[in-house]
Amino acid sequence: MLAHWDDVEWTRIDRGPLQGSRQRLGAAAGAVRAGLSRYRMGPGERAMPAHVHADEEEIFYVLEGSGLSWQGGRAYAVASGDCIVHRAGAEAHTILAGDEGLDVLAFSSGSDTGITWLPRANAWWMGPRWLPSDGPSPFAREAAAGELELPEPEPTRPATIVAAPDVAADPMRHGRVESQWRELGAAAGAAASGMNLVEVAPGACAAPFHCHGAEEEIFVVLAGEGTLRLGSKHAPVHTGHVVARPPATRIAHQFIAGERGLTLLAWGTCQPNEIIFYPDSSKVDLCGIGVKFRVEQLDYWDGEE
């Protein structure tokens, strides 16, 4: 439900050319299917092997530093505020730190198969097992492959990498809601998930109080402070808080900014059969067919006499 990245343990990655540290923020906050990891790499380090997921989409967001996004043998410069989308079954990819080091959030949409291809290791992850099954783990094979060959950075970046300031902000203003939304994931071509950079005005709400029937969401507070309204409870939040909202909890949520405003990343899966309920107004949104209506909540036995 709620965690703070200062309280989540770091795991050191030390496998030959794979170096860095990782936090499993999504699991710490109670995510069910979706994933969120934070990778911190010193200058020149690479914490993850070159890989591509069979059915899982990833969105990276650079918190601090600079480096290179390696994609299918090409390299692209990335820096703080960049969003990088890796669609399922697309190019093999990894990310490397530059001279300043690199701090990256990696969101993942969840997998039904657990299949991941590591081309340099010439191996597959198959959930907790791997192929070839009679050899070392894919991580060991990746380490044995040695340092990743790095070409010179390309002069232009692909459409799957966008800088937050280059994405237009869409205002959301009505009643107590006053916020600006930058749809970073959509701008970078995400299909199975979405990510927004949300700036909430001081004292205002980010969006109406709501809960999801099918989509899972993860929020990361990047700056400012405020309050998380969760059902009948309220919890203070500030920079570094991570909030996971699995689907079908029946518990609505809302962010309310404090005096300094609130900036957060709002990531979520995309489901065509999504249903959203707004308790404050008793509305239901059938997103797949674009129909909204007001409902009266009843007891199971109402009208059954």
Task: Mark where each language-model region is.
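Ligand-binding loop in jelly-roll beta-barrel domains
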Residues: R74, A88-G114, P247-E274
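Conserved short histidine dyad/triad with adjacent acidic residue
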Residues: L18-R22, S37-H53, V177-E183, N196-H212, ...
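Short, conserved beta-strand element in jelly-roll/cupin
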Residues: R38-G42, V52-Q71, S109, L197-A201, ...
